Amino acid sequence: MVINDIESLTDQALADVAAAQNLDHLEVLRVALLGKNGSITLQLKQLGKLPVEQRKAIGEKVNCVRDLISVALMDRKAALESAALSKRLIDERVDVTLPGRRGERGGLHPVTRTLERITEIFARLGYELVEGPEIEDDWHNFEALNFPLHHPARAMHDTFYFGDGRLLRTHTSGVQVRYMSDHRPPLRMIAAGKVYRSDSDQTHSPMFHQIEGLLIDKHATFVHLKGTLSEFLRAFFERDFEVRFRPSYFPFVEPGAEVDIAWQQSDSSVRWLEVLGCGMVHPNVLKNVGIDSECYTGFAFGLGVERFAMLRYGVDDLRAFFENDVRFLRQFS
């Protein structure tokens, strides 16, 4: 008999399929039973050796067994895959009661922090924040502010000029000129924003941020200026230190002064640091904006925001504020 006990082979094959514990084992069984040299395949190959009268009946039986085993293999494969999926879902289940992952939080740039801190302090002192154009004309940037024609600030190596005579503002003082032209005293305002100068090194940038303040009123004096700036500096740095006013020259103020603070360094030594410039508004400036200098006086001051940010946060190189190094910026988030 070429066909060996097909019933026994079928029973054993179905039992082995049902006992398969994983997909790899099941694949081994499939190859052993239905593969090119599998036991069922070999039975089909031997049909040609049977007498003609037996081939049809036995062939139908072997084909039926093959189909039965194929169905059993598919059913067992589906069951094993379902069991594997269920196990994976259990292993990877999400506990919805656990807190979610916190998203990364950004932070304000240190220059922005410093700008907001300065403007908030002056707002408490009654100063209005005013903005103006970054592209200026010669009148608002120089002439109205009493800059003589020979002043070095007008030179090409200090100022960025456009071909039509306009320029990138070198300070925010032009905002003060516009404000004084449109408003009548008493005035109390600050102007904040980007300014541009042709200079770049460790402590200078071709673009930086500046805040300038202005007060115009009857009987405003240098004493009021000193009191305002001393109060601001102590509020900004949150410490009580000595403040020194040194005579200096600025075309738009008379008298003018540089302001120094007694800064305590990391080794506990103290040295004077220049932090801003100021002075009483020059009568010519008041005249240029239509304010009677016989009735009104005023004072003005200006400071570099990056300079204050460097002091507050201990930054040695101004360029760090503009390099977008995430490692640096994360310190302020």
Swiss-Prot record:
One GO MF term attached to the UniProt entry: ATP binding
GO BP, one annotated term: phenylalanyl-tRNA aminoacylation
Bound cofactor: record note: Binds 2 magnesium ions per tetramer.
Subcellular location: Cytoplasm
Pfam family, one: tRNA-synt_2d
A single GO cellular-component term on record: cytoplasm
List of residues binding Mg(2+): E254
Catalytic reactions of this protein: tRNA(Phe) + L-phenylalanine + ATP = L-phenylalanyl-tRNA(Phe) + AMP + diphosphate + H(+)
Record keywords, A-Z: Aminoacyl-tRNA synthetase, ATP-binding, Cytoplasm, Ligase, Magnesium, Metal-binding, Nucleotide-binding, Protein biosynthesis
Main subcellular localisation: cytoplasm
Cofactor needs: Mg(2+)
Top enzyme class: ligase
EC number: 6.1.1.20
Similarity annotation: Belongs to the class-II aminoacyl-tRNA synthetase family. Phe-tRNA synthetase alpha subunit type 1 subfamily.
PANTHER family reported for this sequence: PHENYLALANINE--TRNA LIGASE, MITOCHONDRIAL, PHENYLALANYL-TRNA SYNTHETASE
Subunit structure, as described in the record: Tetramer of two alpha and two beta subunits.
Protein name: Phenylalanine--tRNA ligase alpha subunit
Lineage: Bacteria, Pseudomonadati, Pseudomonadota, Gammaproteobacteria, Lysobacterales
Recorded name of the encoding gene: pheS
